Design a protein with these regions (language model features):
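Extended assembly-interface regions of large multimeric machines
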Residues: 1-210, 217
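Extended Gly/Ser/Thr-rich low-complexity repeat segments
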Residues: 127-134, 266-282, 446-452
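Extended low-complexity, serine/threonine- and proline-enriched intrinsically disordered segments
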Residues: 132-134, 207-238
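Broad, structure-driven detector of short, well-ordered beta-strand segments within folded domains
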Residues: 141-145, 241-249, 386
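Acidic, glycine-rich low-complexity/disordered segments
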Residues: 157-222, 252, 256-257, 266-363, ...
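A surface-exposed beta-strand-loop module
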Residues: 234-272
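Acidic, low-complexity glycine/serine/threonine-rich segments
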Residues: 334-617
Length: 617
């Protein structure tokens, strides 16, 4: 019997695999089961595999199913092991840690404030210690940096320009940590919120730890004195005595703070105390409009540990604003607070990590500046573009000459930036044009610009890693307003064209579709198109037209004048500079390439539906 079985099972009785080179791509439980049955049939030894319910058939089912599951996990694991194919936040977070990329967590709202001192405050140099906060209508805004100012007289005095920024949220003192003395010792703050790609209901209403709001102090076991430690992009850039740490948002959504090993960054000794402070944001509920904080006074943050830290860190000559005289300082926020910005997603990390790796912790090229600002100031800046001094003169200033200005530097927006940020030698200037993330267009009509505090915030961070020869000049873009408009031959275009121009949507009378639905869809298409516009973008009227023509039932588009019997096919717009609407204005139905310093928006877009006419053909 054994001899017969051995003869029948001889390898020569089995066929070749005869699989195509891409057969692996179609393998699943069913194909594997069929392949096993086919090969058993070809061997001629077994027959029960052809009968469902037989023991061998059941065994084949188990093998095929196990193979199917294992293949699924193999494919998933293979995909998640590479940077370009990873889809899970935990995996891509780990992958980019190999190139020292640090994903950004959720960022809280920022408010720019002005500061005034009442007559009761005596003339002197004062410091409002960091973590002091104001509260209005149960909403808190705290400072993560010291605010210093000088009171020069006994009258009511505005003591600080609008260049102070507060972070929305409440200051928190994390439990004291005692160091163990290990090299590269790591302290973790467990975030109660999950990693960014995990879905929660009402995520916008859940408080969170605000990234970039951390302050760390260390008390030496040897001296018993508290000292502030600063964040660094990499400990490997630090000396053995550098009081620096690395911060990282890990794959679980928790913040890690890594200290040195005695060679790269100062090493914590056993018994050293580490105290971490941060801001817990109220999320979107804490975003306030302009003047909401008017009249609020600072409340000095105080705990036994923090009071001792202030005594150790600051010299005896420092005059602090204390709880006894905080009422003599009042603030106001002249502009809206910035929006809350979500943490970097998997797609954001995949886009930003290669760019930040190429920076190598320095700002030299145009791409370096644009990548750095876009990643680190996305709660302040919606769009950014960088021009060299040659480009500034040959493009930006030339634009003002082209619209009739004989002295472009006398333009108020140009002048204020030149005075505040430029130096007498301009050949090394780097001009950063930025569009604010919050309230980009006021009332859908008036262009908005970064305020002085936001520009200074951007400038401070860029100066830390910029090329030593560069002088950074934050600059204001040129805005281009768009609306429906068409002019007849030899007619001088004017802004008023928008008031008697209609967008005519022609729909098939045989298609059952509501006119209101068509108008709403067209409005949505326009809004999406202009929301995606950045500095230097193409305003693609052709794409907008095609998207409208793809609406079911729509068979044609025209732009029509209502004061004269005249219309043109597709979409025609009147385009103008709101600050020079008589000097820079034209009508076009072509796509428009904006210059790198120009930003386009649709003027009063919420009223567009009133200018849409639906006709049946």
């Amino acid at each position: 019997m054994d001899t017969l079985l051995s003869k029948n099972m001889n390898i020569s009785n089995f066929t070749e695999y005869n699989l195509s080179h891409d057969a692996y791509a179609t393998f699943d439980a069913t194909t594997l089961k069929n392949l096993i049955i086919k090969r058993l049939n070809e061997s001629g030894v077994f027959q029960d595999q052809n009968f469902e319910g037989s023991n061998i058939n059941a065994f084949i089912d188990i093998v095929a199913y196990m193979y199917h599951v294992l293949l699924f996990y193999l494919n998933t694991t293979s995909s998640e092991s590479t940077f370009t194919t990873a889809t899970l936040y935990e995996n891509i977070n780990k992958l980019v840690s190999n190139i020292n990329y640090k994903p950004i967590g959720r960022q809280t709202s920022l408010a720019t404030i002005s500061l005034s001192a009442l007559s009761n405050l005596s003339p002197n140099l004062y410091t409002i210690p960091k973590l002091s906060y104001v509260t209005k209508n149960n909403t808190k805004y705290a400072s993560v940096r010291d605010i210093s100012f000088e009171k020069t007289n006994n009258d009511f005095e505005r003591v600080a320009a609008d260049n102070t920024t507060l972070y929305q949220g409440s200051p928190v003192e994390y439990p004291l940590y005692t160091a163990t003395g290990e090299p590269f010792e790591t302290v973790s703050i467990v975030n109660e919120r999950p990693a960014p790609d995990r879905v929660l209901d009402n995520l916008d209403n859940i408080p969170f730890i605000a990234d970039n709001s951390f302050t760390i102090f260390v008390r030496s076991i040897d001296t018993g004195v508290w000292r502030e430690w600063k964040e660094t992009s990499s400990l490997y850039l630090e000396s053995s005595t550098g009081t620096r740490y690395e911060k990282r948002l890990n794959e679980y959504g928790n913040y890690e703070f890594k200290f040195g090993n005695g060679l790269n960054g100062k090493k914590l000794k056993e018994g050293d105390l580490v105290q971490i402070y941060y801001i817990v944001s109220d999320n979107i509920a804490g975003v306030v409009s302009a003047n909401t904080l008017q009249g609020a006074s600072f409340i000095v943050f105080t705990t036994p540990t923090y009071d001792q830290i202030l005594a150790d860190v600051y010299p005896d000559t420092t005059t602090f604003i204390t709880p006894l005289n905080t009422e003599n300082i009042v603030i106001n926020n002249p502009s809206d607070a910035t929006p809350v910005v979500p943490a970097e997603s998997v797609a954001d990390i995949r886009t930003n990590a290669p760019k930040m790796f190429s920076l190598q912790n320095r700002l030299v090229t145009r791409d370096d500046y644009e990548s750095f600002v876009s990643k680190n100031f996305n709660n302040v800046v919606k769009s950014i573009s960088v021009l060299s001094n040659d480009e500034h003169a040959s493009q930006y200033l030339k634009y003002f000459y082209s619209i009739g200005l004989t002295k472009p530097n006398n333009n108020s927006r140009v002048l204020i930036n030149q005075v505040n940020y430029s130096n007498s030698t301009q050949f090394n200037n780097v001009y950063i044009f930025a569009v604010p993330a919050q309230a980009t267009i006021l009332n859908e009509r008036i262009p908005n610009y970064l305020n002085s505090a936001q520009k200074q915030l951007l400038l401070n961070e860029c100066n830390l890693i910029k090329d030593i020869t560069h002088n950074i000049v934050p600059s204001d873009p040129v805005y281009k307003a768009f609306n429906l408009g068409v002019n007849i031959i030899n007619e001088v275009p004017c802004v008023e064209l928008k008031d008697y121009t209609k967008l005519v949507i022609k729909r098939d009378t045989n298609i059952a579709i509501n006119d209101v639905s068509i108008k709403n869809t067209v409005l949505k298409i326009f809004k999406q198109a202009f929301e995606d516009i950045k500095l230097g973008s193409i305003v693609d009227l052709t794409k907008i037209s095609n998207n409208i023509l793809n609406i079911p039932g729509v068979v044609g588009i025209a732009t029509r004048r209502t004061d004269v019997n005249y219309e043109v096919p597709l979409i025609s717009c009147v385009v103008w500079n709101p600050l020079y609407e008589t000097s820079d204005i034209f009508c076009t139905s072509q796509n428009i390439q904006l210059s790198r310093f120009q930003f386009g928006y649709f003027y009063e877009i919420s009223k567009l539906a009133n200018s849409i006419v639906v006709e049946t053909v």
